[in-house]
Amino acid sequence: MKYLAAYLLASLSGNANAASVTKILQSVGVEVDAARVESVCKELDGKDVQALIAAGKSKVGSVAAAAAPAAATSAAPAAAAAAPAKKVVEEKKEESDDDMGMGLFD
């Protein structure tokens, strides 16, 4: 993701190449993987950045919509399993040693 963000910043300046992406990443203290920078630049070279962003938004929206119902169904059994645990946790109160017939100040 950071490589993509650096590429997008470099493309805004009109200088989207591996050297620019590397310089951007190093400026914020990222340890740069040169092979990954080359791969990102090669994959995105010549593509419209706005079209890539629009395609990414549509993919993220479809994944989020599909994942939401799955999370809701898995939460119900977990809540049902947690309810019996509360009944078992009840502790017995220890009897106090206060009234054993040995009062010091009777």
UniProtKB/Swiss-Prot annotation:
Annotated function: Plays an important role in the elongation step of protein synthesis.
Chain coiled-coil ranges: none
Top-level taxon of the source organism: Eukaryota
GO BP terms: cytoplasmic translational elongation
Keyword Iron-sulfur: no
PANTHER family, sorted: 60S ACIDIC RIBOSOMAL PROTEIN FAMILY MEMBER, LARGE RIBOSOMAL SUBUNIT PROTEIN P2
UniProt keywords, alphabetically: Phosphoprotein, Ribonucleoprotein, Ribosomal protein
Region named Disordered: 80-106
Protein name: Large ribosomal subunit protein P2
